[in-house]
Amino acid sequence: MVWWDDPDDAFCEDPFDPEGDYGALQVGKQPMNRYVICYDIVDDKRRLKVAKCLDSYGSRVQFSVFEVLVSKPLMTRMVRELGALINAKTDRISIYPQCATCDARRTDLGATVEKPVHEPWIIV
């Protein structure tokens, strides 16, 4: 069994952050966590599908690197979607959580991509 098929999977639980929020931004009742995701996909078709999936959750910052700002439930759904798209024997996706402190200390040089920001909507 691979990790994304495990129904009891606790992927979003981090032993270093028992609260699981990495000092997260709060949007409504859901804390939003930032992740950097990079991939090395052998097959062109699979690579395109992975890029489209990640593009629906965040912003491309380099050819095979994305930043996403998602809640735990969305992160779990995204990981399951990505897992279904790759060949676990030849492809690799790495997901790095970014705590609020680390993200605030980030330095970008050259052409940069705006950090994804989710602001609450006010409907009148």
Curated annotation (Swiss-Prot):
Q: Where does Mg(2+) bind?
A: D40
* Highest taxon of the lineage: Bacteria
Query: Which co-factors does it depend on?
Result: Mg(2+)
Q: Which UniProt keywords apply?
A: Antiviral defense, Endonuclease, Hydrolase, Magnesium, Metal-binding, Nuclease
Give one GO biological process term: defense response to virus
- Tell me a Gene Ontology molecular-function term this record carries: metal ion binding
**Matching InterPro entries, A to Z?**
CRISPR_associated_Cas2, Virulence_VapD/CRISPR_Cas2
Which EC number applies? 3.1.-.-
Q: Which enzyme class, named as a word?
A: hydrolase
Is this entry keyworded Isomerase? no
Q: Summarize the subunit comment.
A: Homodimer, forms a heterotetramer with a Cas1 homodimer.
According to its UniProt entry, the function of this protein is described as: CRISPR (clustered regularly interspaced short palindromic repeat), is an adaptive immune system that provides protection against mobile genetic elements (viruses, transposable elements and conjugative plasmids). CRISPR clusters contain sequences complementary to antecedent mobile elements and target invading nucleic acids. CRISPR clusters are transcribed and processed into CRISPR RNA (crRNA). Functions as a ssRNA-specific endoribonuclease. Involved in the integration of spacer DNA into the CRISPR cassette.
Name the protein family: Belongs to the CRISPR-associated endoribonuclease Cas2 protein family.
Q: What is this protein called?
A: CRISPR-associated endoribonuclease Cas2 4
Q: Name the species this protein comes from.
A: Rhodospirillum rubrum (strain ATCC 11170 / ATH 1.1.1 / DSM 467 / LMG 4362 / NCIMB 8255 / S1)
This protein's gene is called cas2-4
